[in-house]
């Protein structure tokens, strides 16, 4: 799994730490001011993609190309499961990215695994377990999982 976190002017959205932790510390920061963000002890590997101001269609196009052509040198770990924080920009970017990748989208997940996605429905009164049969894109609710601590400075790559 890999987290994709939309960034505006070096500001991380709510749910960033949850998404990074869910993806074992592997994260792609995309947007403006990504070079100014320090994820020491919060991530294992960080890929920086400075695409400037928010343009969802352009971001989705660039990210899909990166994910589709990725190997472990560019993006560490598996890119079969792409996780975004369920924040405003994440909710906008996720469907555009899922469409570009030709993958299903699971919005508002409360927990993720390689073979299952738990989503809240009916105003949070119901929890549904879904079993994806392949690669997918999901948004993860903020505050559900919490942060994880990774020792030291992450490995940082610029694309």
Predicted features, each with a name:
Residues 1-159:
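N-terminal glycine-rich FAD/FM-binding segment characteristic of electron-transfer flavoproteins
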């Amino acid at each position: 799994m890999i987290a994709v976190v939309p960034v505006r002017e070096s500001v991380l959205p709510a749910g960033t730490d949850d998404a990074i932790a869910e993806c074992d510390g592997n994260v792609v920061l995309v947007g403006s001011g990504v070079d100014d963000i320090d994820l020491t002890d919060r991530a294992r590997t960080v890929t920086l993609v400075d695409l400037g101001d928010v343009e969802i269609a352009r971001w989705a196009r660039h990210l899909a190309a990166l994910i589709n052509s990725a190997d472990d040198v560019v993006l560490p770990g598996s890119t079969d499961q792409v996780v975004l924080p369920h924040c405003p920009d994440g909710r906008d970017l996720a469907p555009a990215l899922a469409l570009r990748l030709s993958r299903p989208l699971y919005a508002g997940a409360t927990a993720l695994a390689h073979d299952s996605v738990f989503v809240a429905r009916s105003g949070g009164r119901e929890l549904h377990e879904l079993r994806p049969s392949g690669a997918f894109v999901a948004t993860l609710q903020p505050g559900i999982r919490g942060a994880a601590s990774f020792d030291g400075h992450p490995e940082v790559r610029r694309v």
